[in-house]
Each structure stands twice: as structure tokens, then as C-alpha cells.
Curated annotation (Swiss-Prot):
Classification via CDD domains: GDH
Gene3D superfamilies tied to this protein: NAD(P)-binding Rossmann-like Domain
Gene Ontology CC: one annotated term: cytosol
Origin species: Yersinia enterocolitica serotype O:8 / biotype 1B (strain NCTC 13174 / 8081)
Alphabetized UniProt keyword annotations: Cytoplasm, NAD, NADP, Oxidoreductase
Segments passing through the bilayer: none
Lineage start: Bacteria, Pseudomonadati, Pseudomonadota, Gammaproteobacteria, Enterobacterales
PANTHER family according to UniProt: 2-HYDROXYACID DEHYDROGENASE-RELATED, GLYOXYLATE_HYDROXYPYRUVATE REDUCTASE B
UniProt-annotated location(s): Cytoplasm
Protein name from the UniProt record: Glyoxylate/hydroxypyruvate reductase B
Catalytic residues as annotated in Swiss-Prot or TrEMBL: 237, 266, 285
Protein family membership: Belongs to the D-isomer specific 2-hydroxyacid dehydrogenase family. GhrB subfamily.
Listed EC numbers: 1.1.1.79, 1.1.1.81
Length: 326
């Protein structure tokens, strides 16, 4: 008899068939109260869980007594209580490698669109404001040869540094607990303190995950140390930046502009002051949102779950210590 799993996000048909080759698949659209009775019944027998979003905490896990593995179709896993999973011996799988290049593309797009005011000026053209030769009130700022600072020199940070260094001749600064030899050798990246980085960079690019240590890592004190011409880019997690402090800094000219793919609350409320600021490019958490990458993420998550439930995991496990307990 095949193990039972719960799938709570639509995936391409061929990937669904791959799951069905190994498991009895109970499919749901999200983890909501709309499907609560059927979902609760399926969870009682489920050995595997695959999807994205939703809060997977202690209370949820108590409804899934047979669960052995959870596979998220994402690199981030801050919606999972990792400690609770680990205590129950449940492996948590994620997709850290397949979205690297696409997220780096998104970050570079935010750098360019914020610096050159692409979104704002496109809207002005559509509104009929382009009536003559443009003046300096339509001008942006250069990207090439400007200094980029990267908070989070992991896979995505490295891919962003590659684009900045080779594509735009940008000096690269970064902060980390340990030197990143590959970044320094390939891109001439310079490791420095956060204060030094904030003071020197023209573009502050954040790729950090949300943890207790990174929560509001960039607040009013840090923003005040930046150049008034600096642009902040966040494609990590929204709460890494104190959003109210950022709004104030953008309103009073402490910094020049921001390109944001992530927010404190998502979806971003329509009444957010960020949406009223012309110096903000706000996009709806599209970091990995291409057809190709989202397919690859789902495929990776499927393979991850199969590996976790067949004892063949070699990578992508958030809490690998539970594999040794099995």
C-alpha cells in the first residue's frame, strides 16, 4: 500500500503523476477553513506534506500524527515551526538552488527600475505628460560603476554580485561572519562591517531570510547612516527592514528610493504609504515568479518529498539531524 500524502498547492499534471507513482495523493487548494473537514481527515493518515504557504506549527502537526516529511515549494521556510518538526522527527525539505538565478534577475531589475525611475516615468508617459523634450525632472541616476552592498552573500547574493560586477562594473561590498573567498576572488568583493557598508554603498541589496537575528536589521539608525542618494532593494523577507522607518526615510529624503519585492504584510495593503511614494518600485513578491522557475521549484519539491519518504535524501533538508534519527 502506498504512503498517503497531502498536496496543498496545484502543480503541473506531469509532476502530479510523478507523485501518484509513489503515493496516494490527497489534493487541496491551500490550507484553509473551506476544506477543513476533508483536510483534517487526510492529515490523520498523511506521511508526507507538499505545498507552499500556510502556517505549519505545533497545532497543525498535532493533526498529522503520522507525518514523516514536509516539502515546501520555496526556499524560505519561516512559516514552518522547524523546532516542532524536528522534535517529531519530521524532515523539512525546501528548494534553495533552482530559483537562484531568477531571483538575482529580479533584484537587478529592481536596481535598474529604481535608479532609472522606469515604472514612474512609464506611468507619466501613459498619462500624457510627455509633451516635449524631457527635462531633468525626468532624469534618473546611473547604475554602472556605482557601489553595491549585499546583505546575504549566499547563493542569490553571489548571483547578484556576478551580475553587478561583470555586467555593470560595480564594486561589491558585503557583510558576513566569515570571509567569502569565492566572492572576493571572482568579483573583487570586499568584506566590511555593516556600518561601513551602509555608509559607502549606492545600492543596499538585501537577500536575507527572516530570523530572530535579522528581524528589523535595517531600522531608523541604519537608514540614517546611508547616503541620501542611496537606493534600498529588498528581495529577502519584508520584516528584515523596519517598514515604518523605511517609509519615513523615503518621505524625508534620508535615502533616495527603494525597490521592494517583499513586505511586512503580504499582500501589501492598498492603503500602505509605500504605494503613494513615487520613489518606490513595489512588486508582488515575484522573485522566483517565472513559468520556468516555478515549474523547476515544484519538480524539486516533488523529488525532495520522494527522497525524504524513501530514505534517499542527499540535499535540500533544513533539519538533516532528523534523518540520522530515522
Amino acid at each position: 500500500m502506498k504512503p498517503s500524502i497531502v498536496l496543498y498547492k496545484s502543480i503541473p499534471a506531469d509532476l502530479h503523476q510523478r507523485l501518484e507513482q509513489h503515493f496516494t495523493v490527497n489534493s487541496f487548494e491551500g490550507l484553509s477553513s473551506d476544506n477543513q473537514p476533508e483536510l483534517l481527515s487526510a492529515l490523520q493518515q498523511a506521511e508526507g506534506l507538499i505545498g507552499s504557504g500556510g502556517k505549519i506549527d505545533q497545532a497543525f502537526l498535532e493533526r498529522a500524527p503520522k507525518l514523516r516529511a514536509a516539502s515546501t515549494i520555496s526556499v524560505g521556510y519561516d512559516n514552518f515551526d522547524v523546532d516542532a518538526l524536528s522534535q517529531r522527527g519530521i524532515a523539512l525539505m525546501h528548494t534553495p538552488t533552482v530559483l537562484t538565478e531568477t531571483v538575482a534577475d529580479t533584484m537587478m531589475a529592481l536596481v535598474l527600475s529604481s535608479a532609472r525611475r522606469v515604472v514612474e516615468l512609464a506611468e507619466r508617459v501613459k498619462a500624457g505628460e510627455w509633451q516635449d523634450s524631457i527635462g531633468d525632472d525626468w532624469f534618473g541616476v546611473d547604475v554602472h560603476h556605482k557601489t553595491i552592498g549585499i546583505l546575504g552573500m549566499g547563493r542569490i547574493g553571489m548571483a547578484l554580485a556576478q551580475r553587478a560586477h561583470f555586467g555593470f562594473s560595480m564594486p561589491v561590498l558585503y557583510t558576513s561572519r566569515r570571509p567569502h573567498e569565492a566572492a572576493e576572488k571572482r568579483f573583487g568583493a570586499r568584506r566590511c562591517s555593516l556600518d561601513t557598508l551602509l555608509a559607502e554603498v549606492d545600492f543596499l541589496c538585501i537577500t536575507l531570510p527572516m530570523t530572530e537575528q535579522t528581524y528589523h536589521m535595517i531600522g531608523p539608525e541604519q537608514l540614517a547612516k546611508m547616503k541620501s542618494s542611496a537606493i534600498l532593494i529588498n528581495a529577502g523577507r519584508g520584516p528584515v527592514v523596519d517598514e515604518q522607518a523605511l517609509i519615513a526615510a523615503l518621505q524625508d529624503g534620508t535615502i533616495h528610493a527603494a525597490g521592494l519585492d517583499v513586505f511586512a504584510q503580504e499582500p501589501l495593503p492598498v492603503e500602505s504609504p509605500l504605494l503613494k511614494l513615487p520613489n518606490v518600485v513595489a512588486v508582488p513578491h515575484i522573485g522566483s515568479a517565472t513559468h520556468e522557475t516555478r515549474y523547476n521549484m515544484a519538480a524539486c519539491a516533488v523529488d525532495n518529498l520522494i527522497a525524504a519518504l524513501t530514505g534517499t535524501v542527499t540535499e535540500n533538508c533544513v533539519n538533516p539531524q532528523v534523518l540520522q534519527q530515522a
